Design a protein with these regions (language model features):
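Histidine/cysteine-enriched polar flanking segments
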Residues: 1-254
Length: 254
């Protein structure tokens, strides 16, 4: 079985090599000009894994990168719903699915995503998937009080951590925006308010990999204790500070 992992185009060679050693075929996602610089390369803003195995993306993004996606042999679903660079127009696909429950800013989430789930829980946080590090189907980590409350209401075990300490880096979008205008490049701006969910990804049922050195994260001990209690081990995919890279999306071919 081929297992593809879709990641931010800016992941280091070190991280790509670590994922390849685990058996994944690594696909670096190009930027999408319709989105803003901080999320234009983020998998959790570009792809949504539907329950039927298809990956949902905006039709314009697919058109721009058709050859890249088609050569995987995976199945895709497309949407032409409005998307933009400003919040909350950029959260179309940034919803969280956990135990068959969909969490998100429901007035901004794709209709296709909502139609795939019978149970919806609305939250104020538009970047729901990026804000939550899911450790399997029953445990989650977040810094967002609204999401904590929503997850607890559905029986999930939740670790609440303070925000901060996670890098968020702007990328230079390429191509054209939703109005057909050429995207102006931006500088390599860096912030330290990234989300915990965007800094890691579950690699199988019992391992969570992180973009950076998870042991250097200031809340590592607390996170490790919580993860261990749920049978999950934490591994660093790279060195350097923890970075919000929009998580990753894994899809396989049998």
């Amino acid at each position: 079985m081929k297992s593809y992992i879709f990641v931010h185009q800016g992941v280091s060679d070190e991280i790509e090599f670590a994922l390849a050693l685990l058996g994944y075929i690594v696909i670096r996602l190009p930027s999408f000009g319709a989105l803003g610089p901080y999320v234009c390369c983020h998998p959790d803003s570009l792809l949504f894994p539907l329950p039927d195995g298809r990956l949902l993306m905006h039709e314009n993004y697919y058109r721009e990168n058709r050859e890249l996606f088609d050569r995987t042999g995976l199945r895709f679903a497309l949407t032409d719903e409005p998307v933009g660079a400003e919040y909350p127009q950029d959260v179309l696909l940034n919803a969280l699915a956990l135990r068959d429950v969909l969490y998100g800013r429901l007035d901004s989430v794709s209709k296709t995503v909502k139609a795939a789930y019978n149970k919806h829980v609305g939250v104020k946080q538009g970047y729901a998937r990026c804000s939550v590090l899911a450790l399997g189907e029953r445990a989650a980590v977040t810094a967002d009080r609204g999401l904590e409350k929503a997850l607890l209401s559905q029986g999930a075990s939740v670790l609440m951590l303070p925000p901060g300490g996670i890098i968020l880096r702007a990328a230079a979008p390429s191509g054209f925006d939703e109005k057909g205008k050429k995207i102006k490049p931006v500088g390599d701006a860096v912030r330290c308010d990234g989300f915990i969910g965007g800094s890691g990804v579950m690699l199988g049922e019992d391992t969570c990999g992180f973009f950076g050195d998870i042991t250097a994260y200031k809340h590592y001990e607390q996170l490790q204790s919580f993860a261990r209690s749920h049978g999950v081990r934490l591994v660093s995919l790279g060195t350097g500070p923890l970075e919000d890279m929009g998580g990753a999306v894994i899809a396989g071919l049998k």
